[in-house]
Amino acid sequence: MDDKKAGAGVSAEKQKALAAALSQIEKQFGKGSIMRLGDGEVEKDIQVVSTGSLGLDIALGVGGLPRGRVVEIYGPESSGKTTLTLQVVAEMQKLGGTCAFIDAEHALDVSYANKLGVNVGDLLISQPDTGEQALEITDALVRSGSIDLIVIDSVAALVPKAEIEGEMGDSLPGLQARLMSQALRKLTGTIKRTNCLVIFINQIRMKIGVMFGSPETTTGGNALKFYASVRLDIRRIGSIKKGDDVIGNETKVKVVKNKVSPPFREAFFDILYGQGISRQGEIIDLGVDAKIVEKSGAWYSYNGDKIGQGKDNAREYLRENPDIADEIENKVRAALGVVAMNPTAAATPVAVED
């Protein structure tokens, strides 16, 4: 009995000491600097924005890319990296969000972005001269609390000032990696507080002399690999032809890292030239997988009605009948447990004081 009383006394003392410590922390660093997970003040449901690809939203496990996080999208040249990010920009703008594009490569095609559904009139764009300038602009935009999505295209083009001002053959090892490491240390906390999604596009390089394992690596050192909540590996796996003409690419995206859901899932979709990700093509493929759309030979049917012979004709039918496309998509979402996007999901501005 005495032991129980003693235990209760120690427990009460501990609780009192903890309450005093929490009070001191809040007094020194502000309310909300520390809290219990069960208090309700901590965000339990992850806010997301769609990638523009239903299959990729499903592969990500939460219905899209998580807000308030860092995301890395990498792959070989012409694999669809910029197309995918511009689709995310278009989806964020549909939700009423404000987006910025840091074009370090100085290669953004405005007319192509417009074709993908991006409202280019409202898109903020910066074409910085140095890597430091690009990351300072990113930091200022994140701290404003008024930006919902920032795209940096690309990490490989974030050239340190010392390299630009130096001679062509100068050896400056690790300079870009140190720049990225310092920037991400500074940015990550602010990104979380302002609920801003920051997407880094990255390129692939080959490591020399690798005998075992993949010789591929991404630029900018290892910091981004650690700080990114989601890493997507995008690859072109084939061509889409109409007769003898190539009209698009068959694309595979692998979720290499995912801190908000199980990783290593894959998504397959078509990217059509001048149109972006083929929503209708994905609805057909996922509809067949979920047994919502029937396929018999080359014919596709829905509710007993034939919708086209061959995927191209079925895709065209859904493009001409958007109501049926929406109906099939909603059934696919329900079957796979992926909810539709919330139209009021844009963040409330939260400025961060220096």
UniProtKB/Swiss-Prot annotation:
GO cellular component: cytosol
Name of the protein in its database record: Protein RecA
Family: Belongs to the RecA family.
Signal peptide: none
UniProt: ATP binding residues: G75, P76, E77, S78, S79, G80, K81, T82
Keywords of this entry: ATP-binding, Cytoplasm, DNA damage, DNA recombination, DNA repair, DNA-binding, Nucleotide-binding, SOS response
Superkingdom of the source species: Bacteria
Chief subcellular location: cytoplasm
Stored Pfam families: RecA, RecA_C
Function per UniProt: Can catalyze the hydrolysis of ATP in the presence of single-stranded DNA, the ATP-dependent uptake of single-stranded DNA by duplex DNA, and the ATP-dependent hybridization of homologous single-stranded DNAs. It interacts with LexA causing its activation and leading to its autocatalytic cleavage.
UniProt KW Cell cycle keyword: no
UniProt-listed GO biological process terms: DNA recombination; DNA repair; SOS response
Organism: Cupriavidus necator (strain ATCC 17699 / DSM 428 / KCTC 22496 / NCIMB 10442 / H16 / Stanier 337)
Localization, UniProt: Cytoplasm
UniProt GO molecular function: ATP binding; ATP hydrolysis activity; ATP-dependent DNA damage sensor activity; damaged DNA binding; single-stranded DNA binding
